[in-house]
Design a protein with these regions (language model features):
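Catalytic core of non-heme Fe(II) oxygenases with the double-stranded beta-helix
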Residues: 66, 70-189
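Non-heme Fe(II)/2-oxoglutarate
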Residues: 1-85, 101
């Protein structure tokens, strides 16, 4: 039987992308008419609900970036999670303006999200360019604090199981940019 001996749920790596790569991705979003993000899952059609999720997004298909993401997903999965993962889902660049947020949720569920195994979020913004916008997880951190908060360093990546409850707290000043994608495989159940 395969076990997760370290019981890690959130993996963080600094300098996944350079500052110039982050800026290039932020500019890509601004040049490509972002759309309002929808809620996905157990619905007949995806829906928009700004009370739950308020941000914009644009998809990006960059082979070099996709390969780099896949390689890190596979390394983290081999070392820690040990899931059956097979393919990278669409990569999206997200923009959260003042008031932007995403309340507590998971990234896996029914229908098209049922095959999501791992989530990756890359911090594109400089952490001093916005206030609020913390990526929080519904797990206790090493200090005993109830919600673990991910690091906000530009270019860093955070990988975690898609079933792990998380949120982005409301932006109170500035703009937060991030990149998100998922590694998919056969559903857990």
């Amino acid at each position: 039987m395969i076990t997760n001996d370290t019981f890690e749920f959130v993996v963080h790596k600094e300098n996944f992308l350079s500052e110039s790569q982050c800026v290039k991705l932020m500019r890509y979003l601004e040049r490509n008419e972002p759309t309002i993000s929808e809620l996905a899952g157990n619905y007949d059609n995806n829906i928009m609900n700004k009370e739950v999720r308020d941000n914009q997004e644009v998809k990006i298909n960059d082979e070099k970036l996709n390969n780099k993401l896949k390689m890190l997903f596979e390394l983290a999965n081999h070392s820690i999670f040990k899931y059956n993962i097979q393919e990278l889902e669409s990569v999206k660049i997200l923009k959260y303006g003042v008031g932007g947020k995403y309340k507590w949720h998971t990234d896996s569920g029914a229908k098209e999200t049922s095959t999501r195994k791992l989530t990756a979020i890359v911090q594109l913004s400089d952490e001093t360019n916005y206030e609020g916008g913390d990526l929080e997880f519904g797990i206790t951190d090493e200090t005993g604090k109830n919600n673990y908060t991910a690091k906000r360093t530009r270019g860093s990546i955070t990988i975690f199981p898609a079933f792990l409850s998380h949120r982005v707290t409301p932006i109170t000043q500035g703009t937060r940019y991030s990149l998100i994608t998922w590694m998919n495989g056969d559903c857990f159940v």
